[in-house]
Amino acid sequence: MRTQTHIGVMMLLTCLSFIPGSFGKEKETPKPTAWGYVRGQGVEARLQTSGNKPALTRLGHGALVTVLDPGAKGSSSSVRIGAVDPATLSPQTGNIDLSQIEIMPLDKFPSDAELLRLVGGRFLDDLIAAGTTVARFLLRQGDQPPALLCLLGGSDLPYTQLQVFLPSRGKLVAGPSLNFPTSEMQVGLASVEVRDLVGDGNECFISREPFSFGPESGGANYLIRRIEDGELKVLWKVPIEFRNLALFPPNPEVAEPPEDNIGAPGTISRATIEFRARGNVSQPVWKGKVEFYVFGREKPVQSVSIERVCPWDGKKFAPLR
């Protein structure tokens, strides 16, 4: 009798799990209620991807996130958001301080599906569109309405697309774009930052972009771009990591000027970029070191340190070399 009762209870629970509104129903993903524009110097937030523990993530100035619902109960200063990591294009969720974002209405910007239709081409395919993740950034354009810059990509796509949407008659239209092969980029850009470097209100888009010339040669470039006359213009491009161990010269020699050693055979170069104010302009500074290697030795035989300020000439920043 007990066995029959147990079987009956299990059958009842199984049936209830398929009834709408029953306790067997899976929790629905929260729907966006607004947009959140990350302002100021950006924000450090504890976000998590699906199934992972929360990790400290930096949301840079200019990032556009979705507001999902209020954060912790009883805390009016906390809000739950959805964001996309530009390096992996993986969706993340978590709580941040409400004071660190500017709330914008949901109808101010098109949905992801609407943006993909504006781009057209391969994104009109339903399967491709469903597997595409969109990371968003706002670029202020002086007195003009801001432009929307998006990273479009996914693990099954051959390249990640950097797509600009320009304001036109109160709407957004697809503007210039760049493609990055996923064989080099993995999925997204290693880092993204938005800053007004020139002081005219026309914000720049700063990115760290990996490159590869083979298993023993590759690194990452640091690029500063901004929108001018409806196009993405490169204002500065320098390597901040450059490993070239495909060849080793028999007798390494330090070239002059020192920056000419960056990327030379048998060297590893690493640098950080700082910005120094000069009037209204923030000038980039390349600070790093080039290490020289010989075949068969793990440690460098010599190194040279470099620090170079690259001033603004009115159109672009001076090249490193």
Regions found by a protein language model. Name each.
Residues 56, 86-87, 151-156, 183, ...:
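Short consensus segments that form the blades of beta-propeller domains
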